[in-house]
Amino acid sequence: MKRIPRKTKGKSSGKGNDSTERADDGSSQLRDKQNNKAGPATTEPGTSNREQYKARPGIASVQRATESAEMPMKNNDEGTPDKKGNTKGDLVNEHSEAKDEADEATKKQAKDTDKSKAQVTYSDTGINNANELSRSGNVDNEGGSNQKPMSTRIAEATSAIVSKHPARVGLPPTASSGHGYQCHVCSAVLFSPLDLDAHVASHGLHGNMTLTSSDIQRHITEFISSWQNHPIVQVSADVENKKTAQLLHADTPRLVTWDAGLCTSFKIVPIVPAQVPQDVLAYTFFTSSYAIQSPFPEAAVSRIVVHTRWASNVDFDRDSSVIMAPPTENNIHLFKQLLNTETLSVRGANPLMFRANVLHMLLEFVLDNLYLNRHTGFSQDHTPFTEGANLRSLPGPDAEKWYSIMYPTRMGTPNVSKICNFVASCVRNRVGRFDRAQMMNGAMSEWVDVFETSDALTVSIRGRWMARLARMNINPTEIEWALTECAQGYVTVTSPYAPIVNRLMPYRISNAERQISQIIRIMNIGNNATVIQPVLQDISVLLQRISPLQIDPTIISNTMSTVSESTTQTLSPASSILGKLRPSNSDFSSFRVALAGWLYNGVVTTVIDDSSYPKDGGSVTSLENLWDFFILALALPLTTDPCAPVKAFMTLANMMVGFETIPMDNQIYTQSRRASAFSTPHTWPRCFMNIQLISPIDAPILRQWAEIIHRYWPNPSQIRYGAPNVFGSANLFTPPEVLLLPIDHQPANVTTPTLDFTNELTNWRARVCELMKNLVDNQRYQPGWTQSLVSSMRGTLDKLKLIKSMTPMYLQQLAPVELAVIAPMLPFPPFQVPYVRLDRDRVPTMVGVTRQSRDTITQPALSLSTTNTTVGVPLALDARAITVALLSGKYPPDLVTNVWYADAIYPMYADTEVFSNLQRDMITCEAVQTLVTLVAQISETQYPVDRYLDWIPSLRASAATAATFAEWVNTSMKTAFDLSDMLLEPLLSGDPRMTQLAIQYQQYNGRTFNIIPEMPGSVIADCVQLTAEVFNHEYNLFGIARGDIIIGRVQSTHLWSPLAPPPDLVFDRDTPGVHIFGRDCRISFGMNGAAPMIRDETGLMVPFEGNWIFPLALWQMNTRYFNQQFDAWIKTGELRIRIEMGAYPYMLHYYDPRQYANAWNLTSAWLEEITPTSIPSVPFMVPISSDHDISSAPAVQYIISTEYNDRSLFCTNSSSPQTIAGPDKHIPVERYNILTNPDAPPTQIQLPEVVDLYNVVTRYAYETPPITAVVMGVP
C-alpha cells in the first residue's frame, strides 16, 4: 500500500487518542538532509537556525495543544519496534487494525471539532480518505513508549523553546527539540547543555565557537590558536621606554668635551742638561738652591716639540694625541703610519707619502684639540710680583706645580740668567683674569678671559670649535617650540626661564648639513637589503609601541562564525579564507614594516612577495585563487610599489585567461604573464591606462576591475612633520617640512574615535568584495559551483565587506600622525620621492647618488639597467599579514586619542639623547668636507682649496691610494667622536677623489631632478687648513726640515749647527760650476788610472768631483751602486753632493765640542738604510752649547741642511747669563709678544708665521644639559 503523504514533521501512532502534536526533535531535518543531497536552501546571512525553528508550525501547535491538556496521555506500547524491526502504529499499511484505528481517530477528531479545534493539526487527506495526525504524545523520539507525565513533557518543551542559557558567540550550537539539543556536526541529540558541551568537545571544538559547519569550526579553532601568542597581537605597552629610545638613536657622539688644564700643544723639553764647573755651581743654580720654581727648563739646550694636551685636565680623552719625541730620538713613525707597507725599513719611511702622513698628523692634531676651555674659578694671588692678580684655580692635588708655567711673571730673582732677564722684561700686569667680572646675575659668568701660558694655534682651534658649537646652540624657547612641533602638539612642552643663560645645547643644524648626511646614508644602503631592513623593523617595533591599534584576529574568526553554511558543502569559503590568513610560515610584522616603508620610498620599494600571488597565475574558477586575489587586492595599496595598481589588475587578468581577453600591446608581457613581472612602467598595458580599450562585452569583469582601480585606488597626501627651522630637514626631493603618504590623510579625532566606513581603504575593500560577488554570481566563471556554495561565498564576502575593523580608519587618521611624530627622531630620516598613484609618466625609475669631479658636474645622471626593476632596495612583504591587520584592528576600550598619544610619545621625547642624531649629522658633514679637503691636497680633484703643503713630496694619489687615505681619516674621526658605527664608509669604496656629491631622481617620462647639496663649511677642515698654514712656517716644531741636504766632508773647529750652516757651504743649481746628475747621466770609468768621467744633464763629460746635484729618486733607485762608488770621494772631500729632498724628518746627535767628533759613521749608516721605497731620518751632528769658555776640538761634518731648520730651538743655557761656545739662542721674545711688548694688543696673535706661547685664553662656564633637562614635558 502506498505511504500516506505527510505534512507534519512528527510521527503518528495510528491511534485516535494519540493526536496531540509534539515539538519537532530534529530527526525530520536529518531525514530531509539525507534525502536532499544538494543541501537545504541557503538562508539569509546572519539568520540563525534557532530562529528558523521558531517559525515552524509544529512548535506553535505544541503550545496551543498544551494549554488545554488535563490528563496524561496513555502509554503506547505499540510504537515499539518488534524483533524484525517493524514498528507498529507508525505507518498506515494493509493491516485492518491499523485501518480501523485510523477511521476511529478520524471520527473522534470530527466529533470534538468545536472542543479541541486548537489542539489538533490535520494533514492533507491521505489514502483511503484518512487524515494523518501528529505524533502521539506517548511515543518518544525513537518510537518507543514515553512514561513521563504530560506536565513534565510540557515543561521540557517550554524550556527548550524559551532557553534560559546565556547567549553564545556565533550561531547557536543546536536546534532544540522537546527532548534535548542536537549537534550539527553528527546530528546527535543530547538532553542537556552540559552533555552537549562535552559532546562538542569530543569533536575538538571550543564550546563557544560551535557553528553550523564543522569545517568552519575546525578552521576557527586552528586560526585562533595559531594567533594566540603571535607577537603582532601582543599589546606592546610593556616595552621598556629605554629599549624604545634605543631604536631612535645610534651612538651618541662626543661633541662637547672640556679641558680645565693649559690650552697648549707645544712643550718645551730639555734636550741636554746644563753642564757647569763646580766653582760657579751656586751662582748658576741660584733659583734651585732657594727652591724658586722656573717657568722654563734650566738646561744647556731646550727645544719645542709637539705634545697635544701635555698639561690638560679633560673629562674625556679623544684618543687622538700627537706626541713627538725630542729630536734626539727617532720620530720616523709619525711619517710612516699611512701608505707604508710592512716590507719597508723599520727606520725608514716612503718620502712620496710624506705629505699624506703630515696631513694625517695635522688632522690628529686638530681632533685632539676639539675641547672647550673650562672656567675653573679664580683666587687672588698674594705674591708680590703679580700685583694681586686673580689667578685661575686648577683642579687636582698637583695644581701648585703649574702656576710657574702658567704665569712666568710670578718669578722674580736678582739672579742673572736668560730666564730671569726674560722675566724682568715682561709686562707684569698681563697675568691672570683680564677685563671681566667673575659673577653675572648672581652666578658664575658664561666666559672669562685669562692671560696664561698657551699656544696661539691651540687657542685658535678651540676658539673656532667653540664658535661652531655656539652657532648650533638653541635657547629654551626654541626648544619648546621645536619639540611641540615635532610631537604634533600631543606633548605639552614648557621651558622655565632661569636668571642665568650659561647653557650650551648644540642641537641646531642646517638643512644642507642634514642633506649631506642623508646622501651618505643613501650611499651606505645602496642595494643592500640587510642595511635598510633592520631600520624598518625597528620603526615597526616603535610604531607598535606607540600605536593604540591592536591586531585582534578573533575579529575575523567571530565574523566568520556568523557565516551560515550547510554541513554537506564540500567547499567552505569561510574555512578557506581562515586557512589563508593563518600565520604559519609568514612574517606577520609586514603590516607595520609596510607603514615604515612609506618613509623611505626613495630608497626602498616594498612589494608583495611572489608567494602571495595565485599559483601559476591562478584561475577564476578556483576558490583558493579567489581568496589569494582578495588578499592581494587588499594589501597592494599599502606598499610603496609604484606598479602596484597594474599588478592588481594583471592578477585578475591572469585568472581570467580563457574567459575574458584584453588587448595587450607587448608580445612578451601578455595576459598570461605573471602579474608580479609587471614591475616597471614600460610593461604597463595600454588597455590599463586607457580602460576604453577594454571591451565591456568581451571582458566585463576586467573592465569593471580597471574602473574600480582608476576610481578607488587610494590618493596620495601629505602631512607636516619636524621643525626644520631649528632641527633642519634631510628632505631632498620634497619640501623641508613635508612627509608624503600613499593614501589619503584626514585629521584625527582628538577624543574617542568611532568606527568609520567612509574612508578610502574601506571603500576599496567594499569594491573588491562587490567585484568578487559578481564573479561568483556568474555561472560562466563558476560553472561547477552549487547554489549553496555561491550563497555561502556571497555571505562570506558580505561579512568581510562590513567587518568591524578599525585599521582602515587608523591608517587614514592616526598612522600618519605616528609617522610624523617619530620621523624627526629617527637615525635615518625619511627619504621620499612623490607618490604618483596611476600616473605612469611620473613613476620613479632611478634614484641614485653620483660622485664626480667638480669640473664634470654636468655629466648625465646614473643610467640603471633595465633589470633593475625597483627603486632602491626591493623588500618583499607577505600580503596575508597586511590583510589580517586590515581586517582585525581594534582600539582599546575608552580610548581618548590625545591622552593615549601623550602617554606614548612623552617617554620618547623625555629621553636625554633623543636628538643626538642631529649632532651626528653635523659630524658627518664635518667629516665629509674634511675628507674632501685633505684628498684635494694629495690629488687633483678640482676642489678649490689652498695647498700649503705642496713643497712636501707626494705622489698624485690614485683611487686606491686615496681610498686608503680616506679610511684613515674615517677612523680618526670616529675615534675622536667616540663613534662605533658607520661614518664615511660609503665614500671609501670607489674613488674618493670624486669630491662632488649629487643625487638624482628620474621619472619615466625622462624628467630628472638633480640635487647638488651645498657644502656649508667645515670647522675641522678649516682648522686643518690653518694648522697646515702654520706648519708651512713652523715645520721644525713638527719634526720636519725643509729644503735639501748636502753630503760632503766639512772639517772645522767652528761650533756651528748643521741645521743653520754657514752660507758659503751651500750651493744650488744656479751656483757656478755645479753639475746636475739627471736620469740620462752615465758614468765612464777612466782607463789606465784616469779619473772617472760622468755625462751630466747637459751631455758634457766632466770629472766626478766638485759640487753635484742628485734628485732623491735617482739616488734611491741606485743607492747600492752610489754607496760603493762615491763613499771614497765623499770621505776625502773631493765630492759634495746635494740631494734634493724637499722635506725630510731629521734626528739630532749632540756631541761634546771639547772632543774630536766625526760624523761619517752616522752618514754611512744613513746611506746604507736608503731603499727605493724609504729613507730614514736624516742625522745631524750638533755641538752642545756651553756657558763658559772651552777648548774646542775639530769636528768633521758630512751632512748639512741647505736651509735654516733650527726654529724648534727654544733656548741654550737658559739658567746662565749667556752662551759662550756653540749655538746660541735666547728665550724667544717673539713667541711672547703680548707678555713682552706693552704696545701689543692683548688679543693679538701672530699666526700663521709664529706660534705664540702666551695668550689670552677665553674660558667658559657653560652647562651642557640634555634637552630634557631644560624643558618640562607634560604627557
UniProtKB/Swiss-Prot annotation:
Subcellular location field: Virion
GO MF annotations, alphabetized: ATP binding; ATP hydrolysis activity; RNA helicase activity; zinc ion binding
Record keywords: ATP-binding, Capsid protein, Helicase, Hydrolase, Inner capsid protein, Metal-binding, mRNA capping, mRNA processing, Nucleotide-binding, T=2 icosahedral capsid protein, Virion, Zinc, Zinc-finger
GO terms, biological process: 7-methylguanosine mRNA capping
Zinc finger (C2H2-type): 181-203
Signal peptide: none
Residue stretches of biased makeup (Basic residues): 1-12
Protein name: Inner capsid protein lambda-1
Native source species: Reovirus type 3 (strain Dearing) (T3D)
Lineage: Viruses, Riboviria, Orthornavirae, Duplornaviricota, Resentoviricetes
